[in-house]
UniProtKB/Swiss-Prot annotation:
Pfam families: 2OG-FeII_Oxy, DIOX_N. This is Flavonol synthase/flavanone 3-hydroxylase. Changing residue 287 to K: Loss of activity. PANTHER family: 2-OXOGLUTARATE (2OG) AND FE(II)-DEPENDENT OXYGENASE SUPERFAMILY PROTEIN-RELATED. It is an enzyme of class 1 (oxidoreductase). Keywords: Cytoplasm, Dioxygenase, Flavonoid biosynthesis, Iron, Metal-binding, Nucleus, Oxidoreductase, Vitamin C. It catalyses: a (2R,3R)-dihydroflavonol + 2-oxoglutarate + O2 = a flavonol + succinate + CO2 + H2O; a (2S)-flavan-4-one + 2-oxoglutarate + O2 = a (2R,3R)-dihydroflavonol + succinate + CO2. Expressed in young seedlings (at protein level). Expressed in roots, emerging leaves, shoot-root transition zone, trichomes, flowers and siliques. In cotyledons, expressed mostly on the adaxial side and only in guard cells on the abaxial side. InterPro entries: DIOX_N, IPNS-like_FE2OG_OXY, IPNS-like_sf, Iron_ascorbate_oxido_reductase, Oxoglu/Fe-dep_dioxygenase_dom. 2-oxoglutarate binds at residues 204-206, 287-289. The gene is FLS1. Residues 196-296 form the Fe2OG dioxygenase domain.
Length: 336
C-alpha cells in the first residue's frame, strides 16, 4: 500500500489553503490556542569551553533537573560540519519521490529505520505534519547502509564524520550528568549500554503548512532515548512545556540542543527530568531538524540505578528491556 507523504500533501494543500481533516488537531492541542503569548523564559545555555568545571556541572545539573532541556555552545562539533550535515539532509528531501522511497521503511518492519511518515499511534487518529528519515550512525556493528541515502553522494561521509563528534559530545554530557548524581563519570553511559549504546539519526522534514494554527509537526511527547542531541535549521518551531504552559523555544543558531529523555529520567530515579516538547510548523517555510537519539541496545534492561535508591528513596520506575519499553510507549500501553 502506497503511503501518502506530507511533502506531497503540502504541495497540493498550498494551492487550496486547506489541510486534510486528519491533520487538524483538537482545540486542546491547536498551537494558536495553546501557545503562551507572554514573556518567554530563556532556555538554559551551557558553555562547554568554560574552564570552571564546577560551574559547568552546576549549570547542566540545574537545567536537567528544572527543564530537562538545555543548549550547549563551544561543544566541539565544527560549525562547518553541521552546515554540511544539514545540506546533505536537505538535498535528500529535495530528491524525486522515487529516490526517497528507495530507502523507505519496509511495511512489515518492526524497526523504525528508513524514510517514512507515521511513527506512533495517535489516540485520536490524527496525523503529524512531518516526513522523516531514521538510520543508526553508531556503533558500526549496528549501521545498516540500506537506509542511508546514496544521493547526495557525500551523505555517508558527512554522517560518519558527524557520528564521531556527536558520540564524543554525548559522552562528555553523560559524564557531567553522572557526576551531578554523585556517581562515577561512566555510570550513566554504562546504564545505557556502554560502548554498545546506539546512536539513531533522525531527519525531520516539516514542509510549509497553510494552516499552522491548526496542525502540529510532532505532537507533545518525551523522547524514548537517554539523551537527544539536536540541531535545527533556521526556521523556529520547537515548543517546550514548562510551568503548565507551552513556550516557543528560542535557541542560539550555533548551539546543540540537548533533551533529557526517558531513559535518563529512569536511570536517575526521577532526579533528571525528561522534557515534554512538540513542534509547530510554518506557513511559508520548511523547517528541518536533525536529532540524534542515544539509546540502549534493544535487550538492555533499564531502571533506576541501585546506587540512587534505598529505604528512604525507593525506585520510582519499573525496569524494562528497551525494546519492550519502546513498544509499549509507541503503542500507548501502560509502563507501570
Amino acid at each position: 500500500m502506497e503511503v501518502e507523504r506530507v511533502q506531497d500533501i503540502s504541495s497540493s494543500s498550498l494551492l487550496t489553503e486547506a489541510i486534510p481533516l486528519e491533520f487538524i488537531r483538537s482545540e486542546k492541542e491547536q498551537p494558536a490556542i495553546t501557545t503562551f503569548r507572554g514573556p518567554t523564559p530563556a532556555i538554559p545555555v551551557v558553555d562547554l569551553s568554560d574552564p570552571d568545571e564546577e560551574s559547568v556541572r552546576r549549570a547542566v545539573v540545574k537545567a536537567s533537573e528544572e527543564w530537562g532541556l538545555f543548549q550547549v555552545v563551544n561543544h566541539g562539533i565544527p560549525t562547518e560540519l553541521i552546515r554540511r550535515l544539514q545540506d546533505v539532509g536537505r538535498k535528500f528531501f529535495e530528491l524525486p519521490s522515487s529516490e526517497k522511497e528507495s530507502v523507505a521503511k519496509p511495511e512489515d518492519s518492526k524497526d523504525i529505520e528508513g524514510y517514512g511518515t507515521k511513527l506512533q499511534k495517535d489516540p485520536e487518529g490524527k496525523k503529524a505534519w512531518v516526513d522523516h528519515l531514521f538510520h543508526r550512525i553508531w556503533p558500526p556493528s549496528c549501521v545498516n547502509y540500506r537506509f542511508w541515502p546514496k544521493n547526495p553522494p557525500e551523505y555517508r561521509e558527512v554522517n560518519e564524520e558527524y557520528a564521531v563528534h556527536v558520540k564524543k559530545l554525548s559522552e562528555t554530557l553523560l559524564g557531567i550528568l553522572s557526576d551531578g548524581l554523585g556517581l562515577k563519570r561512566d555510570a550513566l553511559k554504562e546504564g545505557l549500554g556502554g560502548e554498545m549504546a546506539e546512536y539513531m539519526m533522525k531527519i525531520n522534514y516539516y514542509p510549509p503548512c497553510p494552516r499552522p494554527d491548526l496542525a502540529l509537526g510532532v505532537p507533545a511527547h518525551t523522547d524514548l532515548s537517554g539523551i537527544t542531541l539536536l540541531v535545527p535549521n533556521e526556521v523556529p518551531g520547537l515548543q517546550v512545556f514548562k510551568d503548565d504552559h507551552w513556550f516557543d523555544a528560542e535557541y542560539i543558531p550555533s548551539a546543540v540542543i540537548v533533551h533529557i529523555g526517558d531513559q535518563i529520567l529512569r536511570l536517575s530515579n526521577g532526579r533528571y527530568k525528561n522534557v515534554l516538547h512538540r513542534t509547530t510548523v510554518d506557513k511559508e517555510k520548511t523547517r528541518m531538524s536533525w536529532p540524534v537519539f542515544l539509546e540502549p541496545p534493544r535487550e538492555k534492561i533499564v531502571g533506576p540505578l541501585p546506587e540512587l535508591t534505598g529505604d528512604d528513596n525507593p525506585p520510582k520506575f519499573k525496569p524494562f528491556a528497551f525494546k519492550d519499553y519502546s513498544y509499549r510507549k509507541l503503542n500507548k500501553l501502560p509502563l507501570d
